[in-house]
UniProtKB/Swiss-Prot annotation:
It comes from the Eukaryota. This is Allophycocyanin alpha chain. (2R,3E)-phycocyanobilin binds at residue 81. The gene is apcA. Belongs to the phycobiliprotein family. Although originally identified as Cyanidium caldarium, these sequences derive from Galdieria sulphuraria.
Amino acid sequence: MSIVTKSIVNADAEARYLSPGELDRIKSFVLSGQRRLRIAQILTDNRERIVKQAGQQLFQQRPDIVSPGGNAYGEEMTATCLRDLDYYLRLVTYGVVAGDIAPIEEIGLVGVKEMYNSLGTPISAVAEGIKAMKNVACSLLSGDDSAEAGFYFDYTIGAMQ
């Protein structure tokens, strides 16, 4: 839930107007909108590069997953792994745009551990892949923008552990 929605819901639950503090937080959120959109655009424009480089790093760090018997062994399973990384990158962009972890949590992380466990997919490898994406993505961003995006990558990584 965005800061705007949270503030309105809280104020309405108490049958009151928005407080000066709530209005300041909303103002700050609105003023940061261009920056958040810029970050999301950079990540979106570079998604293929981010996913490809992160996949290469992951497969070098974890050769077990691309070896016979590994979850990403073979062309089809490697493509599935990269597709999953792309999915998590997309979730990160949702979080950046919203300025909130709610889209990441509500759209993509509910039941993820159970799903990967049922498929026999090592969750640690998924987390390592997301961390590799963070490194690639943050190298494309300025320091402040990198910290902003990094927060959402870190949240996603943490949910995998």
